[in-house]
């Protein structure tokens, strides 16, 4: 996509009535615009993000055999009266009459509709258990809409409904759905937790809520800004770390890092350990994971990597000895004979210690990009948090699952004849607030420049910023060539072909949060290089333009659903 053909809609400042960091950034980055209280239009950038989150959810739901359908948002009020929820919902349920004086409601949820339609059909087909889902708009007449799409009147939701002949079958699907929700939120890299919850207006007898942390108030947001600014000031005055020469140390029979640290007086945080997992590549059967010695890897994060074989499996002693010809304790990142993936916190360390891939030897003062040049960086660290079984004051509900029993099937008088005995129909329902997920993600992933999207849900995965495109034919032609090649590789790319000052282009691209940024300039092209910036890590690299596509493809940015 070219910016000259795209509605970027970014703003220098956010309107005064915005509430919370996500609301401000969504307005400023041109994702949404307010129509009325609690009602928002999704502009192109926001709509792209929304659709990518929908596709992740759709992919995970399809994997467990759920079937996608679509139901009307307008529902007869009679079915709500039959279920007993017409009065229970009160003013949140928007009611109206058609020209024939028949009353309808705008749906906040679809339990009544799915029960009426599907159970009547299944009465003849007898297909159990079965799980349906839809991704569609809902409406709730909120008394106090706030924080943009965090709490709005109209919102996009994934709601699903399962039907069963017994409670055991319902419990099994309920567990599968709970694990599926975890996979969805893990793919979004959300910081969330699960709690047992009240069933509320939906009803039923068991329910769990998924909550994500967010900055609940302007006071909290401002305090975060102060901390952020303070850290920036401190970093400016930190003494620059001297890069030391690489040293090979003979440490015979030291197999424990605790012994290594004690003998050489090393801080355990300066030691990098290597873990080996099985790869999907037959010719390259292993992947090395580099992480700080005092950290643990998150198994789910590692298994989610596209390069890793599923289910996750670690290399055993015999495989390590056969393939690498070295004991596990002496494995290290320097010249390792496989793909190397580095945890982002391990990547921040300078002058670290690790194995030399030779028995009884270690390297001291290893540095990334000098001693280790080929690797990928991901967030792989396990974050341990202690959560009370209570709603956290600074969290927001992003998902809710219920075991409903026969609450909806019983009032509608649906049962199934089987073996000449009437059987109850048991239901489960499962919801995810998709438009709320967008806001929640931003609350957890931003900096002073704007939003920080991960590759899967970013509106664009690559941005091309040509410097002085209106003055340099070489910059223009080369930028066009890069753009067409990326498009042919099916990569979402935004080509900033408007004539703007570099500062404005950088500001807009960082504001909307595109993960990979290519900067094309005359100065660099003379040296056959392109400047690359990673929006997620902040890393900057100079890359020979011959290898730019291979470099970008290592991030699997052409992988779409």
Swiss-Prot record:
GO cellular component terms listed in the entry, alphabetical order: cytosol
One of the record's GO molecular function terms: proline-tRNA ligase activity
Organism (species): Wigglesworthia glossinidia brevipalpis
Subcellular location: Cytoplasm
Listed name of the protein: Proline--tRNA ligase
Annotated InterPro entries: aa-tRNA-synt_IIb (IPR002314), aa-tRNA-synth_II (IPR006195), aa-tRNA-synth_II/BPL/LPL (IPR045864), Anticodon-bd (IPR004154), Anticodon-bd_dom_sf (IPR036621), Pro-tRNA-ligase_IIa (IPR002316), Pro-tRNA-synth_IIa_bac-type (IPR004500), Pro-tRNA-Synthase_IIa_type1 (IPR023717)
Gene transcribed to yield this protein: proS
Task of the protein: Catalyzes the attachment of proline to tRNA(Pro) in a two-step reaction: proline is first activated by ATP to form Pro-AMP and then transferred to the acceptor end of tRNA(Pro). As ProRS can inadvertently accommodate and process non-cognate amino acids such as alanine and cysteine, to avoid such errors it has two additional distinct editing activities against alanine. One activity is designated as 'pretransfer' editing and involves the tRNA(Pro)-independent hydrolysis of activated Ala-AMP.
EC number(s) recorded for this UniProt protein: 6.1.1.15
PROSITE patterns: AA_TRNA_LIGASE_II
Keywords from the named record: Aminoacyl-tRNA synthetase, ATP-binding, Cytoplasm, Ligase, Nucleotide-binding, Protein biosynthesis
Notes concerning its domains: Consists of three domains: the N-terminal catalytic domain, the editing domain and the C-terminal anticodon-binding domain.
């Amino acid at each position: 996509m070219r910016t000259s053909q795209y509605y970027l809609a970014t703003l220098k400042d956010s309107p005064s009535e915005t509430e919370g960091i996500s609301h401000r950034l969504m307005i400023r980055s041109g994702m949404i615009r307010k129509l009325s209280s609690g009602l928002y239009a999704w502009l192109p950038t926001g709509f792209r993000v929304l659709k990518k989150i929908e596709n992740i959810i759709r992919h995970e739901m399809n994997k467990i055999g759920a079937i996608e359908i679509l139901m009307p948002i307008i529902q007869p009020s009679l079915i709500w009266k039959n279920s007993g929820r017409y009065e229970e919902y009160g003013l949140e349920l928007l009611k109206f009459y058609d020209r024939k004086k028949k009353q309808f409601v705008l749906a906040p949820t679809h339990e009544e509709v799915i029960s009426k339609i599907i159970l009547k059909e299944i009465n003849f087909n007898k297909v159990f258990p079965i799980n349906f889902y839809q991704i569609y708009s809902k409406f709730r007449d909120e008394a106090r809409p706030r924080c943009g799409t965090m709490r709005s009147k109209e919102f996009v939701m994934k709601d699903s409904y399962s039907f069963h002949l017994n409670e055991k079958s319902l419990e099994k699907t309920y567990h599968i759905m709970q694990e599926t929700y975890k996979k969805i939120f893990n793919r979004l890299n959300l910081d969330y937790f699960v709690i047992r919850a009240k069933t509320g207006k939906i009803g039923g007898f068991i329910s769990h809520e998924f909550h994500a942390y967010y900055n609940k108030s302007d006071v909290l947001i401002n305090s975060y800004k102060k901390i952020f600014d303070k850290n920036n000031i401190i970093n400016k005055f930190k003494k620059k770390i001297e890069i030391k020469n690489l040293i090979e140390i003979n440490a015979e029979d030291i197999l424990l890092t605790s012994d290594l640290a004690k003998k050489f007086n090393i801080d355990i945080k300066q030691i990098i350990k290597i873990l080996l997992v099985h790869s999907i590549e037959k010719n390259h059967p292993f992947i090395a994971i580099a992480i700080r010695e005092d950290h643990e890897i998150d198994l789910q994060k590692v298994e989610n990597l596209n390069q890793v074989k599923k289910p996750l499996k670690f290399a055993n002693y015999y495989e390590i000895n056969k393939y690498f010809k070295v004991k596990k304790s002496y494995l290290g990142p320097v010249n390792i004979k496989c793909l190397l993936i580095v945890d982002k916190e391990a990547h921040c360390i300078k002058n670290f210690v690790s194995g030399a891939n030779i028995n009884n030897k270690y390297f001291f003062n290893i540095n990334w990009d000098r001693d280790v040049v080929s690797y990928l960086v991901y967030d792989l660290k396990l974050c341990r948090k202690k959560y009370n079984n209570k709603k956290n004051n600074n969290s927001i509900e992003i998902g809710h699952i219920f075991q409903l029993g026969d609450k909806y099937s019983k009032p509608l008088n649906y049962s199934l004849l089987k073996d000449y005995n009437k059987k109850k129909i048991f239901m489960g329902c499962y919801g995810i607030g998709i438009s709320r997920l967008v806001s929640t993600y931003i609350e957890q992933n931003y900096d002073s420049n704007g939003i920080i999207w991960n590759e899967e849900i970013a509106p664009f995965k690559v941005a091309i910023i040509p410097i002085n495109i209106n003055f340099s034919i070489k910059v223009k032609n080369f930028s066009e060539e890069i753009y067409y090649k990326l498009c042919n590789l099916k990569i979402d790319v935004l080509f900033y072909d408007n004539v703007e000052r570099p500062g404005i282009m950088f500001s807009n691209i960082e504001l909307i949060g595109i993960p990979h940024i290519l900067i094309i300039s005359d100065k660099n092209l003379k040296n056959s290089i392109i400047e690359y910036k990673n929006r997620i890590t902040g890393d900057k690299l100079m890359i020979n333009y011959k290898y730019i596509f291979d470099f970008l493809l290592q991030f699997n940015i052409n992988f779409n659903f």
